[in-house]
């Protein structure tokens, strides 16, 4: 036993021990040998071109840029190809126009040869007809341009959302107010936007506010139009004796609904514009798959307890009413000057609860 010390208070001393340093020395020697055998790289110079990306173009700061690029790639329109059918129609149209001109010239000459007052009467009637045709052309052109303006505003709004500066969004909202100024339902919304014009500096928030204030009342009116057309189609289909009557009435109500939807959102299409709009609506239905009446509607009807209560004619009426509602929703998507972002897009399920009780009499 040893006496306790300050380092060892219990008095227990550690025995001497030996440690080998050969392994560590061999490791250091191998590392030195490897370093000596490895040749050193000569100094080199590199030319680097540093490009600074602006904040508004940086995809890490603006994730919406990548999303918009993907959507644009998906929604890119198909490239139009050369059509021999259009060439043939144009050629025959010119030929018919020349034939009509020669026939008119010969008719007027014959009338002048018989009596001067007949010739002048024919010239007056021809002038009135030409002026009427010019007026129709101007009206159709204005309607097409107005429909194009609505689509332009929608495309520019989607592009202005990703920008940090609000100048483009403010100009877009001003154009939207000008487009909808004839509708008294947007007066309150236009006043609200005018009052908050200098308070909002964020472009997405400004466009969302414009959608809620300007298009919110119009969306409610559009829902009333869709529901009314769907109910009328359901009732007429249920009581009509012939299937041909059903088809004709569905076409009539669909065309009437599409025109009303276009006029509600600021577009006033003419005859050609209406044909183009109907074609776009049918194409939209075909792309989204909304034109198919399948198990989804059947499940909705069963969920409302109608499967055991409706007769065959009443069931057809409900299905045709749902089809009319789908056409109205597609027209709403196309005619609306802004895409659905701040407000919820209506679905077919929003109309089943209102349409089915109307058919069952509850």
Curated annotation (Swiss-Prot):
| Keyword tags | Cell inner membrane, Cell membrane, Membrane, Transmembrane, Transmembrane helix
Q: Does the keyword Transmembrane helix apply?
A: yes
This protein's membrane topology, according to the annotation, is: Multi-pass membrane protein
Q: Locate the compositionally biased regions of type Basic and acidic residues.
A: 1-11
TM segments? 82-102, 118-138
Q: For this UniProt entry, what's an example GO CC term?
A: plasma membrane
Q: Which InterPro entries match?
A: DUF697, UPF0283
**Localization in the cell:** Cell inner membrane
The highest taxon in the source lineage is Bacteria
Q: What ranges does the record give for the region Disordered, renumbered to this chain? A: 1-47
Q: Which family does it belong to?
A: Belongs to the UPF0283 family.
NCBIfam families of this UniProt entry?
hyp_HI0043
Q: Which HAMAP family match?
A: UPF0283
This protein's name: UPF0283 membrane protein Arad_2632
